[in-house]
Amino acid sequence: MSHHVPNLYGTPIRDPHERKRNSASMGEVNQSVSSRNCERGSEKGTKQRKKASRACDQCRRKRIKCRFDKHTGVCQGCLEVGEKCQFIRVPLKRGPAKKRASVVSIEKFSSDNDPLQYRPRTHSYPMNSGNNYLPSLARNSSFPSISSLFVPSITAQSQQFVKVPYDDIKRRSSLATLGSDSSISTEFGGNYRLDENLNVRQEGKDIVAKGMITPVEEMGACSSNVRRQGSQSLPIQEQRASPYINPFISGRSRLSSLSYTSEATTSEGNTQGKNQCMLTPNSVRSIEKERLNSLTAGCPNKKLGTDGRSDKWDKNSTWKPVYRSSNPSHPSTEKNVSLNQEASAKPLMLGTYRQFDATSFYKVLGIYYNFFHINFPVIPINKSKFTDMLDPEKPNVIDEIRQINNEIIQCFKTALEVLVFCKIKQRRSSKSTKSWSRDSLCDFQKGLYYIQNFNKCIADCFQSLITIKPVLKQNSSVIPSRIKFIYFSTIIVLNFILILAGEESSLLLGPSVGVFNEFQAHKLFLPFENTSPMLLLNSNEESGDEILDYAVLFKRLYILLNILDTLQSFRLGQPKLINLNFGSAIETYFSDKTGHNQVVEKAPVALDNILRNLKLGEFITYFVLNRKSLQVNVPHHLLFTNQTDYGEFAVEKGEHDNIAGKFETLLKKKEILIRKLLNIEQKNDHILENCCNSDAEMKNIGELVCSMITLVSGILDSITNMNAENSVDLDSKPLPNAYFAQDSEEELMSPTQSITSNLASEENTRCTTKDLMGTVSIFMLPMVEECYNIISLIGPIPTTLISLYIRNGNMAKGINDRIMTLSTALNELVQITALFNTLEPFRKNAHDRAKRYYVSATSSTGCYESVMKSMYSGKCAASNASNVAPSEEENKKILKKFADIGWKLMDDSELGCCCCFFN
């Protein structure tokens, strides 16, 4: 029986003899005159136009030459700009209408012989709407090209188009999979189901049930048993309107679909989802390619045994399988989780493929330490120490926990890939794109895949961590602390990604705090003499230094989670989830005083910048915990007379020369300005008439406002010079060639370390803007939002004061100096407006953050009443100022307007810097 299998491009390929007999009936386009004259009965073959003979839709629209590459499936123009190469446009009909009889005969012949219906080639990523699992760098060394990601649409009644030979494979459940539906619906409208008539034993089905498989050549040998049942194919659904929008540009409720999956839900999903095969872009391409190779080579249908599987993988270094299975009958909520049962099947994920994916992963890890670690150490340990933790062949690691180790490391790699690939800056023609693709030509497509599936990748990775949690907790005494450190570091990385993207929900932050509390991480800060019984630390570790080392590392992770919680509370105005008072935790646990082995960063300049940013997070934590909105019932005289005691956070005379120091000073001066403006309206239970010297009040307010405008201008200017897009820019700080070496796994020196090695001997070891060029900071979005709100509120004050001074006609020497200072502030406001327009990601993410008002309180002129003023309206009722002198009347009105600005500044501090409030 002849084999009829489509190739990668959807074109049916038949037996050579049958192809010769039926070439005319199939409507093939032949160049020879004899083939064009061939007829089947009385019907003439229809001539079809090849895609290579016409331009794609994008090139036709741009009126440029379309250089289509049949190997990659993408033309050169679409590949450079990152667009989808499509041929959706239907050419206009020319000449007389074609005879319908020939078309009907071709369709009839194709339906009788073709196992898959003919479909035009489409270049796009399959956006699965079902529950599938994200590809990982350890599983796929070279990401598929765009042409390889075409998933043919199959009718709902059709069987699976490949029979996977897993008869001799016996495996147990895995840890990092969750339940899903029995069919996988794709954006193309097709459903992939397992063949109900496959002669496969139940042991093999357990692997296919919830697995993610990257097939190899031998899988193509089993394609002869495939049959087609349906006669019509479902139409291709319309693609996403903007699939390449970076999730870090717009962060408005992006994770609406992300929800915390409890252990009970996971168990229920595992019971319902049975006999599934997860299809990824790699698996679709490999299946089609290898089926074609096996057909043309005449490969016999043979089964693949367990013993010979690893040898065959080693022969092909491009495609290697990664098995992920889950036993549906094993509930994750069971109290006693057997470690031996979970690790009975030992998939050597990292051990087998370490050499295979070492180059790519170490490159991703190097990008993190160069562009992210210097501003916020999501992995609170230096690179050399953390690289040793990833070694699966560490001593004291028994075989039973190897599977847990591999699953946790795999989740960490996936999370780090999402962070790096979604934040890397892609340009049409830049040296960075060429250097990035040195290791793999398809890294660009990989980044596009993570951007399109951003929400799903984050959700699946976190669900995998939740699935591992029961086993990790029940066997905490035998699992090394380094594995638990990687596990909790992955949770920090996932929360870091969402907050960096500007996500305005806490659907992941709340469960993450719950996981830390479940492992009693907060007890590490209590003065216990013996910390060995804790879940995070192991009592069976021999070295006491190791216990002390990991105790400090776990404290760092909890402090980092507290800072991430603080940033969400600062932006959204919501209560903090962690209210533990850590004291001076940054200087205690992150400085080089903790020891050389567990130091966060070995480079002095980078370490100085890390400590400054973390201290800024510590100050914002103190700032958030002292909000007055949480003290609504406080007496009104205490509301204004009690000043926030910043203690060690007192305002210094000299301004800092870095962004973190400037922003900290800006927040302090903002609190001082709020107190001054509110004291104008109410001061010692008396009203405005008792303000004996309004001119002095205006002078103090003017000087404070001008200094704040100068600080905002300096902050925005530093951000623009450092990284206006807050994305990884390989042009400003290119990676060294050592990252792309194929046979090197030794520790690599980052550009930061190479730069700072010469600066370490100098007296000034502080990090400058030049050292931070191209780096990514999680504090930039809150900084820009806060600066935007402050400028929107205090911007009219200099103009008002200048007009008041000129109207009074008092041109004394002191007044002239004030007018000059206010005029300089106005010039800086113009520069600030231009800087806001330069910050493209923040400008797209901007909305009316400064307008927090009740709709009922809005007047016809557009003015709105402060939310905090409405809350304290009964305590701040002003009386009639009947004894005010006429000459002072205008000044008093201006001061009252300034008091309203103080209330609105208080709204910004108390209710968050990016939220709008409506009634």
Swiss-Prot record:
Superkingdom, taxonomy of origin: Eukaryota
Disulfide topology: none
Basic and acidic residues bias spans: 37-46, 304-317
Biological source species: Saccharomyces cerevisiae (strain YJM789)
GO molecular function: DNA binding; DNA-binding transcription factor activity, RNA polymerase II-specific; zinc ion binding
SMART domains in alphabetical order: GAL4
A GO cellular component entry from the record: nucleus
DNA-binding region, residue range(s): 56-85
Locations listed in the record: Nucleus
Keyword check for Methyltransferase: no
Region named Disordered: 1-54, 297-338
Protein's name in the database: Transcriptional regulatory protein EDS1
Composition-biased stretches (Polar residues): 23-36, 318-338
Subunit-structure text: Binds DNA in a sequence-specific manner.
One Pfam family linked to the record: Zn_clus
Claim: Isomerase is one of the keywords in the record: no
Keywords: DNA-binding, Metal-binding, Nucleus, Transcription, Transcription regulation, Zinc
